[in-house]
Amino acid sequence: NQTPLKAIGHNPRRRWAPMKGQILTTLRAAETVVSGETLSQAMGVSRVTVWKHIRKLQEAGYPISAGPTGYRLTGDPDALYPWEFPGREKTLHYHPRVDSTMNVARTLARAGCPHMTVVVAGCQQRGRGRLQRVWRSTEGGLYFTIVLRPELPPVLAHRANFAASLVLARTLQKLYGVPAQVKWPNDILVA
C-alpha cells in the first residue's frame, strides 16, 4: 500500500530544498510506504540517487525502514541536521562530537561565515565556559555557538548575548513548558 505522489503534496518548485530534506518531508507526510520510484520522480533524480540519500539518512540516525515496496520513516533522530532547516543549510553546522563549538565557530568566523551561523554539537570533548572554565558537555545536551556580527559597538556586544539567553529561556518556558533558567551570563540550564 503506497502513497500516491499527489497525496504527499509534490511541488516541482521546491527544487531548492536539499535532497535529504525533500526525502524527509515526503516520508513524514506519507501515511504509508513511499516507493523509490515515487521519490525519484518527485525529485527528478534516479532511484539509485534516492537510495544513496536514504542510506546517508540511515547512517545519520534516521530510522527509515526499506523494503521491496519502498521506504517509511518510523521516527526521528535527536539531532539538528542542516537539511532540517531549508534556507539555513549553509549557516547551520552540526557535528555529533567536537572539541568545542567555540573553536569551530571561531574558525568559521575567521573564514568569513555570515551573521547568525550556528555550530551545534551532540557533545563536546573540551567544552568551555567563561574564563576558559571547563563546561561538561556529555551526550544528550544541546551545545551550540552562534557567530554574531552585530552592528553594535564592541563595548555593548555582551548585552546582545545576555538578551538572547533571556529570550531563549523564556521561549522554552512559555512555548514548551520547559523549566529553563539563565545561569549568568549566558548559559541556559534545563532541569
PLM features per residue range, with description:
Residues 1-8:
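Extreme N-terminal basic, low-complexity initiation segments
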